[in-house]
Amino acid sequence: MARKSLMVKAERQPKFKVRKYTRCQICGRVHAVLRKYKICRICFRELAHEGKIPGVKKASW
């Protein structure tokens, strides 16, 4: 419940632009959020393994 309220709070426009921070759209995590996809690294990894993110595949060399 607390995380959900923080997600709603993050959507509001801050008084100063520098106070804005990114949150994962799926789980609400604050750290390690990929700006391009607006999701955290953990959710990104899960969705990439499931093939739900187009153009993303596991690297192998």
Curated annotation (Swiss-Prot):
Its cofactor is Zn(2+). InterPro entries: Ribosomal_uS14, Ribosomal_uS14_bact, Ribosomal_uS14_sf. Binds 1 zinc ion per subunit. Keywords: Metal-binding, Ribonucleoprotein, Ribosomal protein, RNA-binding, rRNA-binding, Zinc. GO terms for cellular component: cytoplasm; small ribosomal subunit. Zn(2+) binds at residues 24, 27, 40, 43. GO terms for biological process: translation. GO terms for molecular function: rRNA binding; structural constituent of ribosome; zinc ion binding. Binds 16S rRNA, required for the assembly of 30S particles and may also be responsible for determining the conformation of the 16S rRNA at the A site. Belongs to the universal ribosomal protein uS14 family. Zinc-binding uS14 subfamily. PANTHER family: 30S RIBOSOMAL PROTEIN S14, SMALL RIBOSOMAL SUBUNIT PROTEIN US14M. Part of the 30S ribosomal subunit. Contacts proteins S3 and S10. This is Small ribosomal subunit protein uS14. It comes from Metamycoplasma arthritidis (strain 158L3-1) (Mycoplasma arthritidis).
